[in-house]
Amino acid sequence: IRYEPIGVCGLITPWNFPLNQIVLKVIPALAAGCTMILKPSEIAPISGVLFAEMIDEAGFPPGVFNLVNGNGEVVGNHISGHPDIDMVSFTGSTRAGKLIQKNAAETIKKVTLELGGKGGNIVFADSYPNAVRDGVRHIMSNSGQSCDAPTRMLVERPIYERAVKEAVDEANKIKVDVASKKGDHIGPLVSKIQYDKVINLINAGIKEGATLAAGGPELPDELNKGYFVKPTIFTDVNNNM
């Protein structure tokens, strides 16, 4: 058995954990002896630039690691369809992943995709006592922008009322403030597009008849601008919403 480098790898990373995702893709490729082209998210590019500077300072030969900034429609499509790139690794939305897979098929390159998706957080009556509170904190960490955030909580009926009270109490404890301040709080969403998407979903939940138990579409107290969203919880939700 021989292990050989794949060759040139196109690495496309998301905005929600920029440096983490860069490291997870670049280091294994380097260790395997591959060369690579990294395209970080266009709305979170600074981590990629800093990482490129570290690679340069570490003394890697020119051409082993290459950084290209730009949007997905232009740079991402070029990477996924380029005949001289042997593999593309993408983390991001399912919509973009479909486009990358179709584009890569033209050159029969290897593709790895880690795509968005939300699974329900299931809490049974005999679950450990802090399951609901821990679940809410998990959802709200990173300002709710984690790809594995369990944004739906499915609770067994005998503990439903208690679970609602605990979830609302925990959400109301979470402070929202500017990221530059020290302290135990969450910051704003990453962009206007993401902010508008979340606010539209909150308004849709209200319009479709779910009970707004915490939070809402208004800016948090003492914040009069920015992409800040209150930790929001709906109850009485059904699968048709």
Residue ranges of each PLM-predicted region?
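ALDH superfamily catalytic-core signature
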Residues: M87, R95-N239
